[in-house]
A protein has these predicted regions:
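Rossmann-like flavin
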Residues: 66-67, 71-126
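Residues forming the flavin
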Residues: 1-64, 104-272
Length: 272
């Protein structure tokens, strides 16, 4: 049996890991527009092994109360079980698992109650520099298990009738064709246009996501230290029912050391 996975982000990599951990005997091929963790440039923050998370600061915020709609399709308990498996894999390939930190707030502190709510769930931090080593260890494990990677290749069509994935190299005039018995579609942000193309071509049902507008706010860390001591990546929120909108904080970057440039559709933005 041939399994083809489109996308080497967290979804695709964990899918391949699940297969090999369960002694899958067929062929596994992962196709991605980026590169492996040894050769992926820091400028490519979206594509390559582990996807957008590969060049992040190493925070893991997997919970049904924030982002995503996985629980809608498989239920709350199953979603949390899958999230735990992902977190376990990041710890499993960590070169020094004892260094993994977790902040798990148990109650909202009184000093914010008049103003905001605080999401109560654990946030794991594997370490910014360690994250690169995790990626290498994880990649080596999959390669040792026989997983094949096709890098710098953009999938431009999927022939469902004949079970073919059609791609083209981004570095040369090379066209690829991979036949599959099972297909896992795991593209992320950099493949969203292709996902939309497939949905329109095959009349797949879709639903719009809510619009989120982000504002970067910087302030001295001491202003937030009491919150940071409770939750490293604190998630404050407030709903304005009369206006039909809500406000939340996300991806706090305490005592930041790195800033990465992100190139999307010709625009350049940055992350702390």
């Amino acid at each position: 049996m041939n399994v083809v996975i489109v996308g080497a982000g967290v979804a695709g990599v964990n899918a391949a890991t699940k297969l090999v951990d369960n002694n899958f005997k067929g062929k596994i091929t992962i196709i991605d527009m980026g590169l492996d963790p040894y050769n992926r440039p820091t400028s490519d923050v979206m594509r390559g092994f582990l996807g957008a998370g590969g060049w992040s600061d190493g925070k893991l915020t997997y919970h049904t109360s924030i982002g995503g709609q996985l629980s809608k399709y498989c239920g709350e308990d199953k979603a949390m079980e899958l999230f735990d498996q992902v977190i376990d894999n990041f710890k499993r390939f960590h070169p020094n698992p004892s260094e993994v930190q977790c902040s798990d707030p148990q109650a909202e502190p009184d000093f914010i109650k008049p103003h905001f709510g605080l999401r109560l769930f654990p946030v794991w931090h594997v370490g910014t520099d360690y994250l690169h080593e995790i990626g290498k260890n994880w990649y080596d494990y999959l390669v040792d298990k026989g997983v094949e990677f096709v890098w710098e290749t953009k999938v431009h069509a999927i022939d469902f009738e004949n079970c073919r994935v059609l791609g083209k190299s981004l570095v040369g005039d090379i066209h690829t064709e991979d036949r599959y018995d099972k297909l896992i579609f795991g593209v992320g942000k950099s493949g969203i246009d292709f996902g939309k193309q497939l949905a329109e071509e095959y009349n797949l049902p879709t639903e719009p996501k809510s619009v989120q507008i982000g504002v970067r706010f910087e302030a001295p860390q001491q202003h937030f230290q009491k919150l940071i001591d409770i939750s490293y990546d604190f998630k404050l929120y407030q709903k304005f029912e009369d206006k039909g909108v809500s406000l939340r904080t996300f991806c706090t970057n305490n005592n930041a050391a790195y800033v990465a440039a992100e190139h999307t559709y010709g625009d350049v933005s940055y992350n702390g």
